[in-house]
């Protein structure tokens, strides 16, 4: 036996083995059982026999009185599989047989006088009582050894152990209760992986189930609105629940649903207003508003108006009708508004902490499951080969404290960091009964945590999942630790790094019941959103997460369970952060919190992680109001009012009614029309307006097309330009004229300078004309100089900003050497569209009705 592995003082009662392989525990009066096994190589597929040696004292069978412990060990063998992906273990629970005839053999060296009786004292140890009243303390130490020799005992039970197989050990302690309805049990199921050689692909598990029973004389009932493992005896009357139930009978189911929604809305409003992210003044003001609303001091309109101002939120149109429908009935169900507000405030302080953090190890573990208590203890030890790691589960009963602070703690931790590569994996199960973790206090805290001390993880997985918690009238709380699979990241992984991290705690707030419900109505918990962050563990490897779905159920006896599958990924977000607070129906809050050392960092990020402002603003969602249903109801009830505004609107005439009616009667005299109805006048006025609108639209399009310049557009190519051709011809004429004028001037100058016969009249005329030409040129030069002087005195011409910007852009393009780049020119369209007579004539020519009309000819004459 390894050092330190000894049987506790409270040894288990003796056991016997039947021919069918059933190990039967005798009630009181036998020696412990020693189970031995032969070590076999880990990779072998052979069976490892396990022998159970029992030395009987007498050959007569023993009957199983009350308190008999029956244990059956049934192996489940499966061939080893090597694959790349992990798979979940498939544990199978074997039914327990009824105890048959039992034979107990004592060692040969033990001499007992006739009439000796083996009994178990109240303190735990076994005692031999002889007829002479001599009391001898028996040796109750059970040795766990591993030896290859097979004991020479005809009554042996061989348990075959194959790698990658799963075996279950089921131990059930049943005590006949006085009343079955008062039986309360606590079930602890723990599964431990056993990895194979090269890659961890199949995980065999050892399932240990402990079901203690304790008789009571009262029938326990469970409150539907409570989520903790609390029970209240039925002999204590609950006047508030009876009164609430009596009121509920008089209300219709629809009204009850509205009242429930309104109550949840007010409770959630108080919670969010009193949360840490809001100011204390806001919480006080919101509580005061709720109190005034419940006491009928203010009505729904004033309550919502003040609430919007206090929360700085946008108005919700459906909140006032919702409150009007349900607040009257809510006032009847909640006569005391102070107690309701006090319960809502206290709900934030009472939390139920359920924390699970399971970690897989790559070595072969030895499982020791211990449920300790001050009650009577019964144990059985099954041992195999030496294993390098021991994992123990202990349920401890804390010291007695205040009435509202009782708690049950279940701790699962690993012991021993050493690793071994060979030998048969041995599972050691030490099971002891304990009293149920059941109190009658409303605020009960149950903590389940797994703290690995120094596990060696090689590409393994850390799984965090909600335990399956089931509440009922005939059973207590069943806390199930789910199985864990190791996942090998790659075949080339050679280094093993220790992962040391603090456990993650999941807090499940347990508010007090605000409105008691009938005992037959189950209450389901629906999780909106659940995001978990894994705490950082220093320089650790990336851990792959396999999420297991768990079940969170609250039910009554005889009701069907309503599971809510929740998958919690933990590897997609940064460590030590909380993303969302989860709001559950029935005044329940499910939040996530890391280790106590990280609370300060989490509080700093509360404003950025939580979005309580959105929840406060969205009051309709908190009240559980379906907007589609409300809209349908409103449209259905007010359908007769639709269209009244349109029917009551008066048509505004486009033209003056008096002048229009006179003109219509003047035209109608030719057709014997002497009277005209007002509706006809209005219709003609509207028709005139529509005709003018259509005509203006056409004229606007025609004017825009007329004023559009297509020359600058890249989509058009200039094929002929008559205007430029005419300008070219005009320029030629001007050049010809300038040439002729220049020749005439030169001729005049030559004639003026000549000294020919002065009496020639032709010569005198030329001289006079040359002198006039010189005077004209001098006058033009003086006029140009005067204009330049005036322009210099006025100053430079101011350019438009748009033109200056375009010129600056051109200068920049030329300076940077990118003058070859040409921007796409858009069609120039003026901002003001001017319609002229040409546009109207063109429009009239295009219309078939106006093409041959008199108006077109009158327009053409203009």
UniProtKB/Swiss-Prot annotation:
- What clinical condition is it connected to? Spermatogenic failure 13: A disorder resulting in the absence (azoospermia) or reduction (oligozoospermia) of sperm in the semen, leading to male infertility.
One GO MF term on file is: protein heterodimerization activity
Kindly state the subunit structure of this protein: TFIID is composed of TATA binding protein (TBP) and a number of TBP-associated factors (TAFs). Heterodimerizes with TAF12/TFII20 via the C-terminal H2A-like histone-fold domain. This heterodimer forms a histone-like octamer with the TAF6/TAFII70-TAF9/TAFII31 heterodimer. Interacts with P65/RELA homodimers and P65/RELA-REL heterodimers. Interaction with POU2AF1, via its C-terminal activation domain, is required for octamer-dependent transcription. Interacts with ZNF628.
List the protein's name.
Transcription initiation factor TFIID subunit 4B
Domain Histone-fold: residue ranges? 653-702
Q: Does the keyword ATP-binding apply?
A: no
Compositionally biased region (Polar residues): 219-237
The region called Required for interaction with TAF12 is annotated at 830-862
Which PROSITE patterns does the record cross-reference, listed alphabetically? TAFH (PS51119)
> What are the start and end residues of every segment in region (Required for interaction with P65/RELA)?
511-533
Region annotation (Sufficient for interaction with ZNF628) maps to 100-241
- Entry-annotated residues carrying Phosphoserine: 595
PTMs?
Answer: Under stimulation by forskolin, Isoform 1 is phosphorylated by protein kinase A (PKA).
């Amino acid at each position: 036996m390894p050092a330190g592995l000894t049987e506790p003082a409270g040894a288990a009662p003796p056991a016997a083995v039947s021919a069918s392989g059933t190990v039967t525990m005798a009630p009181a009066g036998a020696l412990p059982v020693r189970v031995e096994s032969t070590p076999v190589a880990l990779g072998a597929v052979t069976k490892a026999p396990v022998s159970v040696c029992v030395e009987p004292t007498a050959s007569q069978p023993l009957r199983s009185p009350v308190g008999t412990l029956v244990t059956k060990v049934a192996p489940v063998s499966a061939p080893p599989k090597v694959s790349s992906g992990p798979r979940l273990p498939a544990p199978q629970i074997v039914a327990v047989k009824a105890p048959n005839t039992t034979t107990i053999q004592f060692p040969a060296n033990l001499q007992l006088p006739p009439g000796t009786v083996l009994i178990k004292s109240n303190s735990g140890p076994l005692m031999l009582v002889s007829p002479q009243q001599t009391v001898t303390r028996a040796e109750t130490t059970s040795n766990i050894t591993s030896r290859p020799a097979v004991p020479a005992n005809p009554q042996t039970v061989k348990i075959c152990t194959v790698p990658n197989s799963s075996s279950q050990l089921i131990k059930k302690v049943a005590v006949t209760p006085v009343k079955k309805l008062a039986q309360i049990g606590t079930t602890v199921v723990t599964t431990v992986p056993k990895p194979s050689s090269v890659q961890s692909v199949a995980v065999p598990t050892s399932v240990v189930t402990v079901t203690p029973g304790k008789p009571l004389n009262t029938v326990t009932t469970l409150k539907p609105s409570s989520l903790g493992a609390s029970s209240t005896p039925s002999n204590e009357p609950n006047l508030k629940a009876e009164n609430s139930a009596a009121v509920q009978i008089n209300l219709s189911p629809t009204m009850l649903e509205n009242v429930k929604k309104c109550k949840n809305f007010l409770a959630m409003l108080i919670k969010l207003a009193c949360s840490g992210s809001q100011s204390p003044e806001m919480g006080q003001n919101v509580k005061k508003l709720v109190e005034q609303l419940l006491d009928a001091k203010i009505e729904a309109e004033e309550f919502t108006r003040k609430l919007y101002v206090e929360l700085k939120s946008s108005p919700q149109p459906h909140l006032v009708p919702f409150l009007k429908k349900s607040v009257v009935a809510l006032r009847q169900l909640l006569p005391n508004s102070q107690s309701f507000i006090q319960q809502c405030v206290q709900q934030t302080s009472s939390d139920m902490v359920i924390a699970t953090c399971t970690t897989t190890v790559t070595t072969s573990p030895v499982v020791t499951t211990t449920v300790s208590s001050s009650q009577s203890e019964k144990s059985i030890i099954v041992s195999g080969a030496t294993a390098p790691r021991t994992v123990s589960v202990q349920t401890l009963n804390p010291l007695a404290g205040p009435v509202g602070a009782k708690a049950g703690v279940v701790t699962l931790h690993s012991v021993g960091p050493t690793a071994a590569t060979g030998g048969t994996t041995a599972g050691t199960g030490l099971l002891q009964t304990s009293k149920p973790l059941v109190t009658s206090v409303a605020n009960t805290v149950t903590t389940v945590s797994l703290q690995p001390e120094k596990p060696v993880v090689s590409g393994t997985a850390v799984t965090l999942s909600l335990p399956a918690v089931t509440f009922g009238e005939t059973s207590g709380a069943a806390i199930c630790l789910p199985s864990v699979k190791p996942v090998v990241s790659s075949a080339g992984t050679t280094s093993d790094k220790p992962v040391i991290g603090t456990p993650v705690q999941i807090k499940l707030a347990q508010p007090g019941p605000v409105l008691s419900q009938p005992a037959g109505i189950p209450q389901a918990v629906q999780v909106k959103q659940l995001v978990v962050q894994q705490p950082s563990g220093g320089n650790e490897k990336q851990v792959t997460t396999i999420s297991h779905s768990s079940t969170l159920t609250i039910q009554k006896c005889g009701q069907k369970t309503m599971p809510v599958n929740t998958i919690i990924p933990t590897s997609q977000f940064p460590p030590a952060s909380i993303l969302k607070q989860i709001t559950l129906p029935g005044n329940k809050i499910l939040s996530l919190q890391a280790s106590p050392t990280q609370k300060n960092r989490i509080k700093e990020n509360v404003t950025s992680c939580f979005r309580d402002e959105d929840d406060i603003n969205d009051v309709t969602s908190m009240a559980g109001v379906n907007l589609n249903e409300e809209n349908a109801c409103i449209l259905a009830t007010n359908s007769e009012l639709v269209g009244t505004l349109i029917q009551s609107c008066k048509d505004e005439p486009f033209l003056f009614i008096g002048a229009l009616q006179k003109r219509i009667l003047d035209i109608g005299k030719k057709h014997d029309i002497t009277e005209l109805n007002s509706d006809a006048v209005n219709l003609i006025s509207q028709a005139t307006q529509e005709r003018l609108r259509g005509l203006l639209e056409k004229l606007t399009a025609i004017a825009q097309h007329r004023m559009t310049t297509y020359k600058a557009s890249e989509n058009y190519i200039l094929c002929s330009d008559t205007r430029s051709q005419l300008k070219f011809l005009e320029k030629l004429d001007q050049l010809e004229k300038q040439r002729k004028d220049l020749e005439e001037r030169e001729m005049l100058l030559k004639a003026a300078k000549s000294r020919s016969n002065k009496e020639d009249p032709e010569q005198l005329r030329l001289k006079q004309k040359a002198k006039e030409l010189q005077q004209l040129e001098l006058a033009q030069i003086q006029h140009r100089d005067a204009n330049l002087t005036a322009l210099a005195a006025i100053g430079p011409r101011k350019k438009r900003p748009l033109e200056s910007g375009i010129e600056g852009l051109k200068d920049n393009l030329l300076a940077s050497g990118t003058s070859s780049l040409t921007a796409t020119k858009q069609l120039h369209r003026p901002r003001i569209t001017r319609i002229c007579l040409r546009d109207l004539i063109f429009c009239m020519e295009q219309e078939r009705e106006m093409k041959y009309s008199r108006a077109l000819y009158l327009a053409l004459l203009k």
